[in-house]
């Protein structure tokens, strides 16, 4: 538990004796109060671990090839930063950092520390509150794909409407499908053949 992690450390010690190279996620380092939610957060973190290591190694390789001598930091769900090694151990804490980056960027670019921010993507739009320059955090329990978890996440309202959402039936039906990242190829404004929200905005 977050209050007494002794049993988790004992379990980790036993695992390390048997499987010294295994990636081990301790739930008290990720989740908050709530056994099931914290367990789900730990399982999700463990599932993302190998992919996170691969992505971070690719970042490091690309930076080295460019001759850039700088540390790598990744943004967390709460708008703060973490080192590459921390992100490799706790990838679940970067899970929703895309909308968070938009919100933090809105604070920096606008000069407002308190605001309502709308992040319009290709398929969806995320709406959230910026308080003191950081996204407001969701309540204790957050559903991720229908699974209850309790790691830090921004409190967002996701709407199935984005710049690439397809418009049909003379404008009476929008989405749910989208041209997504093919917006510059398929939208009418770019010479394509699909009517999208970007075309009528």
Model-identified regions with their sequence ranges:
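N-terminally biased helix-coil "hinge/interface" segments that flank
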Residues: 1-201
């Amino acid at each position: 538990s977050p209050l007494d992690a002794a049993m988790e450390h004992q379990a980790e010690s036993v695992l390390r004796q048997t499987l010294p190279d295994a990636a081990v996620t301790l739930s008290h380092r990720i989740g908050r109060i709530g056994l099931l939610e914290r367990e789900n957060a730990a399982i999700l973190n463990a599932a993302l671990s190998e992919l996170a290591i691969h992505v971070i190694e690719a970042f490091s390789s690309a930076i080295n090839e460019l001759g850039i001598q700088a540390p790598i930091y990744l943004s967390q769900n709460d708008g703060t930063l973490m080192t590459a090694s921390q992100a490799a151990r706790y990838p679940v804490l970067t899970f929703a950092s895309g909308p968070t980056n938009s919100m933090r960027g809105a604070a920096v670019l606008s000069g407002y520390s308190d605001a309502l921010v709308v992040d319009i993507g290709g398929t969806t739009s995320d709406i959230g509150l910026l308080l003191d320059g950081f996204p407001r955090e969701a309540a204790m329990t957050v559903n991720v794909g229908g699974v209850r978890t309790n790691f830090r996440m921004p409190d967002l309202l996701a709407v199935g409407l984005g710049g690439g959402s397809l418009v049909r039936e003379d404008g009476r039906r929008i989405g749910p499908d989208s041209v997504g990242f093919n917006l510059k190829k398929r939208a009418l404004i770019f010479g394509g053949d699909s009517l999208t929200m970007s075309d009528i905005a």
